Amino acid sequence: MSGLDIYPHDPSSSSSTSSIDLSNEAFFSTGGLFLEPPGVSSSFFDSISSKCSDSEPLHFPGYWRNKTRLRSGKNFMFLSVSLSKDRSEQQCKKALAQNDEIPGKDNRKRSVIGGVRRRGTMNTRKHLWAGAVAAMVSKTFLAPLERLKLEYTVRGEQRNLLVVAKSIATTQGLTGFWKGNLLNVLRTAPFKAVNFCAYDTYRKQLLKIAGNQEATNFERFVAGAAAGITATVLCLPLDTIRTKLVARGGEALGGIGGAFRYMIQTEGLFSLYKGLVPSIASMALSGAVFYGVYDILKSSFLHTPEGRKRLIDMKQQGQELNALDRLELGPIRTLMYGAIAGACTEVATYPFEVVRRQLQMQMGKNKLNALAMGFNIIERGGIPALYAGLLPSLLQVLPSASISYFVYECMKIVLKVE
């Protein structure tokens, strides 16, 4: 409180001081009480006055007028308590803050939350674009090796790799090596975009839950597996259509739209999710191994004296460095670690890939499930049949993993992904 005024009133007093102007806004803005002296002890006023002694009271002249008179047969006093402007604002704000009711606070909160959400949405978009560009570059560059891989896994080629390559060049020309590449890019770009973005998102969430500053190896594997499952569920239909197009007779389906209509009309909507179970198993393992191995290698290097020195140098030079020099691992290590992670992933998941491709190629009513198909492949060709085409697949995966992770890391720097 900033001030305390006590106005005694006696009915026998003069008219100039015997009434209160009820229309005076300033008067009533201070607040007050009508008190009967017999019922109020002096200690009551002393206790209030002691709290108000640090500031001078505010006086509002002209309280007592003849215009409005309070009639009473007893003497009374009007207790007026007033606050100085500055302190009243401070005290009001303090009281409102305790109740979370500061004027404009909700608007500011909403503004801050809205800004965070917008930044988060923009960051997610940048993440997705970085992954998509990485997939487009790597897949287009390595399309010939991808085509050779499909010849072994889908058509069951047994001939030498060079013989198969010569056959494609002779019958279809050089463009034959890029057959199905557009669909492959359309399938892989969203898959990689979702995969990369989901991995970073899941890893950050696991860090928040655990309260750690750096992810453990277990958290890396879990985040990678979850990212692989997420991307598979969202993108499997495009992969199924692509497989149908490159198989024998696929040319007659009339492209992506024709293959889509054919599968829906003849086999139903769920035919687009052929091999979902082995795909999920394969991609969960693939994501866990790929991201886990890469991050373990990256973390191991960054904790070495050389790695710590590189981080310090990068921090000191800041924006003066170009995108390549701002790679934490540097260009060579980024490519090398990506290749190692890709090789480990391919060896671990290749049998699932073979089973999935064979499931997608099944026709007719008597269709095998994933487990039965696996045993069927082993019966026909033994364990090596599960790794048919592994060599061309590795030749394709090693540079693909290197390029995709390299381009992805560069795009994150260029797009300023947080």
Curated annotation (Swiss-Prot):
Transmembrane intervals: 127-147, 180-200, 221-241, 276-296, 335-355, 383-403
GO BP annotation list: transmembrane transport
Secretion signal span: none
Keywords: Membrane, Mitochondrion, Mitochondrion inner membrane, Repeat, Transmembrane, Transmembrane helix, Transport
Membrane topology: Multi-pass membrane protein
Any matching Pfam family: Mito_carr
Transmembrane helix as UniProt keyword: yes
GO cellular component: chloroplast envelope; mitochondrial inner membrane
Disulfide-bonded cysteines: none
Localization (cell): Mitochondrion inner membrane
Domain of life: Eukaryota
Recorded family membership: Belongs to the mitochondrial carrier (TC 2.A.29) family.
Function recorded in the entry: Probable mitochondrial adenylate carrier that catalyzes the transport of ATP, ADP and AMP.
Protein's name according to its UniProt entry: Probable mitochondrial adenine nucleotide transporter BTL2
Organism per entry: Arabidopsis thaliana (Mouse-ear cress)
Source taxonomy: Eukaryota, Viridiplantae, Streptophyta, Embryophyta, Tracheophyta
